[in-house]
Amino acid sequence: MAARSPPSPHPSPPARQLGPRSPRVGRGAEVHAMRSEASGFAGAAREVVADESDKIWVGEEGSGGRRGPGGAAPAHAPLLSAPMGSRRLEGISVEEAMVTRTQLLEEELSSLKEELALCQADKEFVWSLWKRLQVTNPDLTQVVSLVVEREKQKSEAKDRKVLEILQVKDAKIQEFEQRESVLKQEINDLVKRKIAVDEENAFLRKEFSDLEKKFKDKSQEIKDTKECVQNKEEQNRLVIKNLEEENKKLSTRCTDLLNDLEKLRKQEAHLRKEKYSTDAKIKTFEDNLIEARKEVEVSQSKYNALSLQLSNKQTELIQKDMDITLVRKELQELQNLYKQNSTHTAQQAELIQQLQVLNMDTQKVLRNQEDVHTAESISYQKLYNELHICFETTKSNEAMLRQSVTNLQDQLLQKEQENAKLKEKLQESQGAPLPLPQESDPDYSAQVPHRPSLSSLETLMVSQKSEIEYLQEKLKIANEKLSENISANKGFSRKSIMTSAEGKHKEPPVKRSRSLSPKSSFTDSEELQKLRKAERKIENLEKALQLKSQENDELRDAHEKRKERLQMLQTNYRAVKEQLKQWEEGSGMTEIRKIKRADPQQLRQEDSDAVWNELAYFKRENQELMIQKMNLEEELDELKVHISIDKAAIQELNRCVAERREEQLFRSGEDDEVKRSTPEKNGKEMLEQTLQKVTELENRLKSFEKRSRKLKEGNKKLMKENDFLKSLLKQQQEDTETREKELEQIIKGSKDVEKENTELQVKISELETEVTSLRRQVAEANALRNENEELINPMEKSHQSADRAKSEMATMKVRSGRYDCKTTMTKVKFKAAKKNCSVGRHHTVLNHSIKVMSNVFENLSKDGWEDVSESSSDSEAQTSQTLGTIIVETSQKISPTEDGKDQKESDPTEDSQTQGKEIVQTYLNIDGKTPKDYFHDKNAKKPTFQKKNCKMQKSSHTAVPTRVNREKYKNITAQKSSSNIILLRERIISLQQQNSVLQNAKKTAELSVKEYKEVNEKLLHQQQVSDQRFQTSRQTIKKLNLDLAGLRKEKEDLLKKLESSSEITSLAEENSQVTFPRIQVTSLSPSRSMDLEMKQLQYKLKNATNELTKQSSNVKTLKFELLAKEEHIKEMHEKISRMERDITMKRHLIEDLKFRQKVNLESNKSFSEMLQNLDKKVKTLTEECSNKKVSIDSLKQRLNVAVKEKSQYEQMYQKSKEELEKKDLKLTLLVSRISETESAMAEIETAASKQLQELALQSEQVLEGAQKTLLLANEKVEEFTTFVKALAKELQNDVHVVRRQIRELKKMKKNRDACKTSTHKAQTLAASILNISRSDLEEILDTEDQVEIEKTKIDAENDKEWMLYIQKLLEGQSLTLSPRLKCNGAIVAHQNLRLPDSSSSASAS
């Protein structure tokens, strides 16, 4: 069969960019992943069928999936690169996959059709030949010409294929050179980018240094503010001392007024009892109303919660139905694909059956032809035996004839002597000599023939044998004639003595004796010479036949080897083509990634990615060695053919030289025999001339042989140089591959550097945010300083208000004198005073209000009403301000009014209460966080802040007694002036604000410390993993080096024939370990506890400065990290410069090699010119030989007539033999192909079934994992919603309780105010003026209760709105969470399909 080129591939799909896959929403991504992996399995099966020579499952570069027939992931072609897992195209839909599948099937069908057409053409050709041969008188020449033309077409097709392959190789070399240039440009671009990045880093460092300078300036400003605060506190102490002296003077006045008040209290006691009874009744009614409203609100909240739960569950059910429908569609699609695969396999089975039937038919035809061939071969063998017997008989006859010829020659010499005597006698008798006739036979001018073919040599052999027989018959006839002539000559000599007549010499007997004797002698010598020449020719022709047969054998061997190589190349080409198709379908990578060598530790696992990658690497090396081996075999075959041709040419030249010598000797002999009468000088001159010619010819032959030797040596040298250049080219290719690998590593390193730079920029931005937060803390400290300045202003105003309040505070002196001892008690004594002392109720209520406020602020600081978020530093400043406003307003709510103008001032206090409520609500929503989010963050961060809260509680407990001691001393004046109480409350508020700010700073610092610790642990873990990988890679490198040594030994054994060896060394670069410095966090010990509040403030400021120093130390550590990374970047730059130097050196080497190539080409040109000159000389010699050959052609024509029949039969025999051999080869090829197709189909079916089963199992596992993750996520969401709802309810209950307490406190205040004498007098005067009873007047004054009821209603409505808002937020979050959960589930499923080992990490995330 003629060698056929494989079908041209369809145009590849456009290459898509690689990168991290964007997961689709829903379960579409899972389906797509399953489909893409199914196509990958099919491609792997095709690869196994195509490349049977090396059945190694090749892994994808950097792929996470397993390879091999039992692996879960598909095996891809070795051309697939990758860096990085088994990646698939994402955007391919089901229809596109089906279209690609149909295209592949159409290509396979077209290739099968072409093969069938070629088989049919071969079959028809054989049948036509058979029909022509079956005719009675077949035209064998036509048959032979048809076969020769067919073989010529096949050889031409093979040569075209070889040329196409060479062109493809040249194109690939050009592509590689272009890629080298592109990669160099990319390196230059990367260097420019690095320079730009370095400039940006330097700019950022400058900015950082400027920020540090600013920070130092601000720290100095804080120190200055501390000093100012200390000075102001000393001034405040002096002012307080002056006020205490004034209070002592006022206390003496108060004692006088208290005596008057005791008289009036007895009258008021009776009135109070009546009022208390009425107030108790009103309270009971109000409590009942409040409880009823609460029950209604609770029922409404439950109803809303249940409705929300119903809506959520309905949406979840709808989503689950949608998921079920999607899963059903996917199952249907998979079933359809399975059915299509089954139909395809059935069609292929039918095709295989048809091929088997065709093979059976061809086998029958070949058997019939073999029978015919055996019959013909038997007949030919019989003919050959008969001819051999005849040849042996002729040889024996020739020996006998030679003996008879020698005897005849002796007789001829004797007769010539007798004839000479007779001639002398005749001359004497006649008186004048007759000239001897000179006969020149033109038939003996022989010429050196051109190179005869095998058939012409065989015909020569047969013709010369027939000539020998013919000459033997002539010799017999000549012997008979000689005997007759001798008898006639004797009788004639007797008669000539008796007679003396002059005219008798013209009689016929005398004529015969004179004319026939030289002719007969000449013919005898001619016949002897012809015999010798024929024997020599036979020997030469036998030698030429042997050489030609050797040539043919070597040519046949070379052609068979070339055919085998072509078949190998065809199979490899098909395999590569299928791999290219798979690569184009699987992943259109623009960058061809080279397979990295695996670590030795990774090779310990039997079925790992590293093992498959290593196998792929060795497979490539094996393929390269096979290609080299094939090239060397081709060169060996060509050299063998050239040697055989040279041998045949030398033999022919020797034969021509021998024939020339014989002809010259023969001619000289003829001249000697014919010209006996001429002088001997001419003969000697002729001999000398012939000898000179012979010597000249011998010298020419020797020079020609020397030149041929020199040319052979030059050819050998050129071959060696070509081999050396080939080895250099291979080394350069390997160097380019290593360079490409190194460039890829450099690019990866630059990408890592860019990632590190981005991480550093993120860290710098975080540090900038921290710096801004510190700036805001400084601003808050400035605000505290301003508040301290503002504290002085109300103290000055208090001096002015003290003179006005002297008359009003006269009644308070007696009370303050009685209850001085009670104000010095601790908190426990305050509680005991509440239970035991009913008389001192007013004073205890005052102290209790202060205590409640302190508890409220402590609860606020404990429960985390301050903002906990680290990133939003703006919100921290806002929360600190809102906290201050809330605390001030709540303190205004609780503060009692002692003046007589309390009724007028009640309205603004109520307004402040409403404002405080609104501010509380706004505070809850300031940061953009809902209370749900806030409490979620709080619960997430509780364990990290437990230690801090304990410390803060301890410090608050230590600070409480100091505050109580100060309040003991101050409460004496607090009963005299309300302004002092307000100042104290403002002081408390400012201190609590500072506490909250410092707590926030501490929390943020601890969070940053924990984050840095976690980052450090992760980096250490990564370092350990990288060390393990490095050790495994070393071990694998050692093993692979040993394997490489073995392979190199085999290669050297192959290259011993051509005396060229090449050694390949592979070095593995060690990855530089990047050490990250650990972040050291120095814990600062708390300073001493101060006795006074001012010292506590200093302590807190010191803590703030300590935290600032901590952060500055963190900044320094980050600086050190930056420096380390800069050093790493410098090292990378140095590596790049080294690589560039290596590249330049290798370029110089390539240029030197190119120069050497040019020199060699010039020397080749000179040799070619020499060869042309020699060819011209040979042509001249051949022309001379052709001139001499004309004389031989006449004899050949006589011989050809006798030899034609024999040559025709022999040609028929040889042609039939060759045809049978070709048919045998075709049969073997067809049988091998059929077996290959059967095995391939079986392997495809097994692999497809296994892979479909594995895909089904994987899909089931992935679906189960995704369902489990979804269930867990839904449970967590439900728990979170229940937690948030419970929290909201508890908050509402707490708010209601606080409101009740506020109302009770207000009522107590009113009752207390009613007990005062001034108010009693005012009420009596008002009743007397208006002519109204006291009870009517109290009813008129009780209008405030209705206002309070309305406020409670408004508060209840606000609470309802808040609950609804929380429920809406929960609903919105559930809706937003559901698609996210779906996306996460899809991503997890996709990762489980690709990397089953990473499923646990994905579910945890």
UniProtKB/Swiss-Prot annotation:
<comment type="function">
    <text>Required for centrosome cohesion and recruitment of CEP68 to centrosomes.</text>
</comment>
<comment type="subunit">
    <text>Interacts with CEP250 and CEP68. Interacts with NEK2; the interaction leads to phosphorylation of CNTLN.</text>
</comment>
<feature type="region of interest" description="Disordered">
    <location>
        <begin position="421"/>
        <end position="450"/>
    </location>
</feature>
<feature type="compositionally biased region" description="Gly residues">
    <location>
        <begin position="61"/>
        <end position="71"/>
    </location>
</feature>
<dbReference type="GO" id="GO:0019904">
    <property type="term" value="F:protein domain specific binding"/>
</dbReference>
<dbReference type="GO" id="GO:0033365">
    <property type="term" value="P:protein localization to organelle"/>
</dbReference>
<protein>
    <recommendedName>
        <fullName>Centlein</fullName>
    </recommendedName>
</protein>
<feature type="compositionally biased region" description="Basic and acidic residues">
    <location>
        <begin position="48"/>
        <end position="58"/>
    </location>
</feature>
<dbReference type="GO" id="GO:0005737">
    <property type="term" value="C:cytoplasm"/>
</dbReference>
<dbReference type="GO" id="GO:0065003">
    <property type="term" value="P:protein-containing complex assembly"/>
</dbReference>
<feature type="coiled-coil region">
    <location>
        <begin position="681"/>
        <end position="793"/>
    </location>
</feature>
<keyword id="KW-0597">Phosphoprotein</keyword>
<feature type="compositionally biased region" description="Pro residues">
    <location>
        <begin position="1"/>
        <end position="14"/>
    </location>
</feature>
<dbReference type="GO" id="GO:0120212">
    <property type="term" value="C:sperm head-tail coupling apparatus"/>
</dbReference>
<keyword id="KW-0963">Cytoplasm</keyword>
<feature type="coiled-coil region">
    <location>
        <begin position="980"/>
        <end position="1311"/>
    </location>
</feature>
<dbReference type="GO" id="GO:0007283">
    <property type="term" value="P:spermatogenesis"/>
</dbReference>
<dbReference type="GO" id="GO:0032880">
    <property type="term" value="P:regulation of protein localization"/>
</dbReference>
<feature type="modified residue" description="Phosphothreonine">
    <location>
        <position position="1343"/>
    </location>
</feature>
<dbReference type="GO" id="GO:0019901">
    <property type="term" value="F:protein kinase binding"/>
</dbReference>
<feature type="modified residue" description="N-acetylalanine">
    <location>
        <position position="2"/>
    </location>
</feature>
<feature type="modified residue" description="Phosphoserine">
    <location>
        <position position="5"/>
    </location>
</feature>
<dbReference type="GO" id="GO:0005813">
    <property type="term" value="C:centrosome"/>
</dbReference>
<keyword id="KW-0175">Coiled coil</keyword>
<feature type="region of interest" description="Disordered">
    <location>
        <begin position="865"/>
        <end position="917"/>
    </location>
</feature>
<feature type="coiled-coil region">
    <location>
        <begin position="613"/>
        <end position="655"/>
    </location>
</feature>
<feature type="compositionally biased region" description="Basic and acidic residues">
    <location>
        <begin position="896"/>
        <end position="907"/>
    </location>
</feature>
<feature type="region of interest" description="Disordered">
    <location>
        <begin position="1"/>
        <end position="79"/>
    </location>
</feature>
<dbReference type="GO" id="GO:0005829">
    <property type="term" value="C:cytosol"/>
</dbReference>
<feature type="modified residue" description="Phosphoserine">
    <location>
        <position position="22"/>
    </location>
</feature>
<dbReference type="GO" id="GO:0007338">
    <property type="term" value="P:single fertilization"/>
</dbReference>
<keyword id="KW-0206">Cytoskeleton</keyword>
<dbReference type="GO" id="GO:0005814">
    <property type="term" value="C:centriole"/>
</dbReference>
<feature type="compositionally biased region" description="Polar residues">
    <location>
        <begin position="877"/>
        <end position="895"/>
    </location>
</feature>
<dbReference type="GO" id="GO:0030674">
    <property type="term" value="F:protein-macromolecule adaptor activity"/>
</dbReference>
<dbReference type="InterPro" id="IPR038810">
    <property type="entry name" value="CNTLN"/>
</dbReference>
<dbReference type="GO" id="GO:0070062">
    <property type="term" value="C:extracellular exosome"/>
</dbReference>
<keyword id="KW-0007">Acetylation</keyword>
<dbReference type="GO" id="GO:0005654">
    <property type="term" value="C:nucleoplasm"/>
</dbReference>
<dbReference type="GO" id="GO:0010457">
    <property type="term" value="P:centriole-centriole cohesion"/>
</dbReference>
<feature type="region of interest" description="Disordered">
    <location>
        <begin position="493"/>
        <end position="529"/>
    </location>
</feature>
<feature type="coiled-coil region">
    <location>
        <begin position="95"/>
        <end position="126"/>
    </location>
</feature>
